[in-house]
Amino acid sequence: MSEDSSALPWSINRDDYELQEVIGSGATAVVQAAYCAPKKERVAIKRINLEKCQTSMDELLKEIQAMSQCHHPNIVSYYTSFVVKDELWLVMKLLSGGSVLDIIKHIVAKGEHKSGVLDEPTIATILREVLEGLEYLHKNGQIHRDVKAGNILLGEDGSVQIADFGVSAFLATGGDITRNKVRKTFVGTPCWMAPEVMEQVRGYDFKADIWSFGITAIELATGAAPYHKYPPMKVLMLTLQNDPPSLETGVQDKEMLKKYGKSFRKMISLCLQKDPEKRPTAAELLRHKFFQKAKNKEFLQEKILQRAPTISERSKKVRRVPGSSGRLHKTEDGGWEWSDDEFDEESEEGRAAISQLRSPRVKDSLSSSELFAAAEPMGTLLQVPEQISAHLPQPAGQMPTQPAQVSLLPPAEPAKPAQAQSSGERSQETKIPISLVLRLRNSKKELNDIRFEFTPGRDTAEGVSQELISAGLVDGRDLVIVAANLQKIVEEPQSNRSVTFKLASGVEGSDIPDDGKLIGFAQLSIS
């Protein structure tokens, strides 16, 4: 008599899983549907590249252990995990309804969003279930860290579950749960990120999820997060410097928002308060008047799932291709290729498979870097001189006549013969470097001028800022604010030749912030 498959433990053997369509991809991983033969069940497998993270295996195991102990109807069930080559595979329950983001995209594509994407009862029903899941996580000392429509999944019965909890977000932070350290890169878009997470001054708590929840509420009504049109550094700057966003932020056609009432808007504003202590808890939000409009899962099944895209419609089939990388590759037509060790390229079978199945690959820069954790920013070729010539330091209370000079200009490169230059190299020459000077006080309260160049198209604001921090010239806590203001200048150098901004590192002791004397402030200018 054969053993009941449901009683079997989940396999940690890669060969027991038949990988199928790609159902999601992002900066940190690829999610594929798969069939587990021993269990006779379809699952979702999230494949995360371990080479790209800075997390020890001990820390990973602790986080996986926490995930395995989470049992709640509004949290996606975690089954098991194991390592395949340089990837961590997380095996989870497959929810065939897809994500709420899939639903949003489907509605927008059909042009059915002119009076708002989802109506209030639908939003209330989905978000009430999300809050139930968040309340459970928060009570158990967990922070989700990535609440958004793309991580809210729907079952075919109308059930709502939060996905992407735990290891994937943990990996994205390099295992630094409280973010007391400085992250080297931002993974993905910061559109849903709370201000206190961006600032990286202190650790953050579960109230960061409440901010993301408020942004998600806007996303469900308008179809996108408020600052979705802007590049990441601009989003950081707008979030930190502007008043909190509202339902209207970034929406051109205000007519689409008319049907949303006061209780919905009030609920959003409660979540989007810059002071995390003023935000309600998940339990408090569940008692908010807006959630009286919530219905049951049968309502979602009828209202949403019957007109939602099927799993095959929203997925990309994977073509099997001989090779040795053991990785997925995105092709120019938007499909995916899986390269593994199954075929010998020298064999007749291998050559036949290559000729039939191989598609044109996207450029090297778009292959694995698109699928897995964001790589370190491209170097900016900034060189820190071994000896820094500095003038006499000035006391904090006085404006110096000549601040200390720090040169970060790149060394001159030998000229190439004209005939040896390619058209690509010639086009790079048209990118004129912008010479900048960052004036701020060092740890001894002495005023320094840090001179450097930024080449559009080659450098990134975050990459340059990170180099300034690595060189010990800028406090690590000021990464975000320096990068955001650098981005502001290089985007519009004609109108933003000089900006003065408050530093996240603040002032020490009895010092009083002063933007004129640059105490607790910095000035970035085009020189």
From Swiss-Prot:
Tissue-level expression: Ubiquitously expressed in all tissues examined, except thymus.
One BP term from GO: response to oxidative stress
This protein's UniProt keywords: Acetylation, ATP-binding, Cytoplasm, Kinase, Magnesium, Metal-binding, Nucleotide-binding, Phosphoprotein, Serine/threonine-protein kinase, Transferase
Post-translational modification: Phosphorylation at Thr-185 by WNK kinases (WNK1, WNK2, WNK3 or WNK4) is required for activation. Autophosphorylated; promoting its activity.
Active-site residues from the entry: D146 (proton acceptor)
PANTHER family: SERINE_THREONINE-PROTEIN KINASE OSR1, STERILE20-LIKE KINASE, ISOFORM B-RELATED
Annotated function: Effector serine/threonine-protein kinase component of the WNK-SPAK/OSR1 kinase cascade, which is involved in various processes, such as ion transport, response to hypertonic stress and blood pressure. Specifically recognizes and binds proteins with a RFXV motif. Acts downstream of WNK kinases (WNK1, WNK2, WNK3 or WNK4): following activation by WNK kinases, catalyzes phosphorylation of ion cotransporters, such as SLC12A1/NKCC2, SLC12A2/NKCC1, SLC12A3/NCC, SLC12A5/KCC2 or SLC12A6/KCC3, regulating their activity.
Full protein name: Serine/threonine-protein kinase OSR1
